[in-house]
Amino acid sequence: EGAALHLEGGGPGAVEPAGAPEGTTITVRDLFYNTPARLKFMRKDSAETAAVNGLMQHLALSHPDISFKFIKDGVEALLTPGDGKLDSAVYAALGRDFARGLVPVSGSGGDITVSGFVTAPLMGRGSRSMQVFFVNGRFIKSQLLTAALEEGYRNQIMKGKFPGCVLSVTLPVTAVDVNVHPAKTQVKFAREHDVFDAVYHTVLDLSLIHISEPTRL
């Protein structure tokens, strides 16, 4: 037996017994019914849907052991298997074409470890939109990590193309500050040079052996 929690208008809700399968289901309806003035500041439905879908993708990629399903207006937009395999989550969340162009990488530098997938040098992309980074399990946007990734591909990728990746960087929690951005999508590293080197050498080791054909997923 499960439990149901209903929240309305931000007030406290009551927890009631409910029959439910294993897992958690979150349903959002009439989000701005009591704050209609905020509704006019929302972007188009397509943009908001893309933002929610992006959030679900990042959650799925950072927790491949959990199955995520995103339903929008009754249509399934995302479903991951939750089998604990990152490549399965990448395939489900980011698509077959992207997943099939990836090769696995892993490396370390002292107490910093780097693991995940990157595109093979001949599978460069037209933008940086498929560069996905996690630090200690948290999705972030980082110019430092982007620079380290792309420096590792220098002279190995076609000019005007960019590598794609799903990379996880793990380091001591004392070596990274996650409270530098309200959305916590940016971090400050205490040892930026060490982090850069760990990512750079992980990618460089791949490019130096001239891998041009991706692993088929």
Q: Which residues make up each language-model segment?
A:
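Short "domain-exit" segments at the C-terminal end of structured domains
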Residues: 213-217
